[in-house]
């Protein structure tokens, strides 16, 4: 049995859940930084006298960086390793986030937010790859959704940090705290193993064999003496252009459109919601409380989706969550009271993030 087949035949155990948590924490810090901006906007705009257009640039420039970082991160991970890119990207966005706290003006803040985006964008796809390459195919969907759930935890962390620190110490404090994940890089380097398929493709077969042998021993399985490599392990990776050719073209188009809808609705609402509520006359603290409740609803959405993908399938779960999210979004927009906004906001958050998690399994 070749090395990759041995890896895939391992029973799900302590190692897989440990990897999920270790990679998930990196995802959490990523989401915390992304979520922090939505809470900072409410006070930053007033303190610096920024127009809605200027605040829009503070948000948008980060997404520009994320798009560039995602492309760069994926390609670089194939050259220098998933683990290396995962660690370096965390360092990049942690430093850039901390620098946002000392930005003297809007121009410098935009520069720092751009590099934050580059780091965040590079880390996200690599995190999914690391987990998916270690987890057996039969439970991969559930693990990817659970990994995505750390995104909700990250936004929850952002809401808590903003609630307790921004009213008391100002928006600078949130960015300083957002830079602390840089110290997590030592845990990444020590406890997260490099991707086995990557090691094989780079000719580092002995290292890949050693990792799988250790996992087999931990699982109480007989350890193979020889490191066999299947021919499939060294195949050329799928090129981007092939995604738009049969049989992938239709699926690629649909997944892109669905992803656009999920991300547009999520960021379009939750990034601006704190500022919109403040503009409606609510205090900063009350606003953060309302948004915090809505963010809490994301977590059961992920967990429900993680169960349903294995019960009724990924396609049915995704379709159901998207349909329910659309209904909730309509009533959320029609909400004429705080109660209506919070209730429909919670339900919308539940289904939106559940769909987000399922989409990542395709």
Question: What does each model-identified segment do?
Answer:
Residues 1-362:
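Transmembrane-helix signature of 12-pass secondary carriers
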């Amino acid at each position: 049995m070749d090395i990759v087949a041995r890896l895939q035949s391992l029973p799900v155990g302590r190692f897989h859940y440990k990897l999920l948590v270790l990679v998930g924490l990196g995802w959490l810090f990523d989401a915390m930084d992304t979520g922090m901006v939505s809470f900072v906007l409410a006070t930053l705009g007033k303190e610096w006298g920024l127009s809605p257009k200027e605040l829009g640039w503070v948000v948008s420039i980060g997404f520009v960086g994320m798009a560039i970082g995602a492309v760069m991160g994926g390609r670089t991970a194939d050259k220098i390793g998933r683990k290396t890119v995962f660690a370096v990207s965390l360092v990049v966005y942690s430093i850039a986030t901390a620098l946002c706290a000392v930005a003297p003006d809007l121009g410098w803040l935009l520069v720092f937010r751009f590099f934050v985006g580059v780091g965040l964008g590079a880390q996200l796809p690599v995190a999914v790859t690391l987990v998916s390459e270690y987890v057996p195919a039969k439970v991969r969907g559930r693990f990817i959704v659970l990994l995505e759930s750390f995104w909700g935890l990250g936004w929850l962390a952002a809401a808590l940090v903003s609630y307790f620190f921004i009213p008391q110490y100002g928006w600078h404090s949130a960015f300083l705290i957002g830079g602390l994940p840089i110290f997590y890089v030592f845990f990444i380097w020590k406890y997260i193993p490099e991707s086995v398929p990557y090691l094989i493709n780079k000719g580092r077969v002995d290292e890949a064999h050693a990792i799988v042998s250790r996992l087999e021993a931990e699982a109480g399985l007989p350890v193979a003496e020889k490191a066999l490599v299947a021919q499939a392990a060294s195949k050329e990776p799928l090129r981007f252009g092939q995604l738009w050719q049969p049989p992938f073209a239709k699926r690629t188009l649909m997944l892109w459109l669905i992803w656009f809808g999920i991300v547009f609705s999520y960021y379009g609402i939750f990034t601006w919601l704190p500022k919109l509520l403040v503009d409606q006359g609510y205090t900063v603290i009350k606003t953060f409380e309302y948004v915090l409740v809505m963010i809490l609803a994301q977590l059961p959405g992920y967990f429900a989706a993680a169960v349903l993908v294995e019960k009724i399938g990924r396609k049915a779960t995704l379709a159901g969550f998207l349909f329910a999210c659309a209904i909730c979004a309509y009533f959320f927009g029609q909400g004429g009271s705080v109660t209506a906004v919070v209730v429909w906001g919670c339900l919308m958050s539940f289904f939106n993030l559940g769909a987000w998690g399922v989409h990542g399994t395709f």
